[in-house]
Amino acid sequence: MQTIAAPSPNFNARTAPPDMIVLHYTGMPTGEAALARLCDPEAKVSAHYLVEEDGRIFALAPEERRAWHAGVSFWRGETDINGASIGIEIVNPGHEFGYRPFPAVQVAAVTELLGDIRARWTIPDARILGHSDVAPDRKEDPGELFPWKALAEAGHGLWAEPPPAPGAALVEGDEGAGVFTLQAGLTRLGYDSAPSGAFDAATATIVRAFQRHWRPARVDGVADGETRARLIALLRLAA
């Protein structure tokens, strides 16, 4: 696999080997602008790699170092996601500048890059995540158009499409055992969703993040039967 060197000064030392990969979209008008920002010492942001829409892969920071891509984030009790992960920025204008599908050549490059990274580090499928998974209250990337299913079919990440679970949908304002079970499942998967039994705004935000990754056809924050069934199936796969 060929990469283009584009060294960023924005990294520091790790305290442990990475065991997670976090995928982002750049969310800027052009890839050139994103690359410039990721290499700007005043910006204090970076990633390990940037993948352009034409499939070119830029190497920004050594994998052995802690790049600054995740910000305030959480997954399975870990709050230093930068320290635990390798960050990949995927060029796409994002929701603010004209979100669009990811070209096949770009997805192929991301897939190849994931295989290359995972040949060097022990990174389980359950720990290949989106920025919106680890920071659902702040981020939406790489978003509902990112082909997570195709990535999983290529051997990277989790995916499940079981039949919908029975029962009424759970929505913001609901309370009870069903909501508690939903929150407990989201927490087991990795989200910061302490079970309370009350479906509040924070729970709806996390459900939307889950849907962006694992039920992208409809991202509405409603825990319907399809959403709940996929959560249950993913918990089995991640166990």
Please report, for each region that a protein language model flagged, where it lies by residue.
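Active-site-adjacent loop/helix surface patches within enzyme catalytic domains
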Residues: 1-126
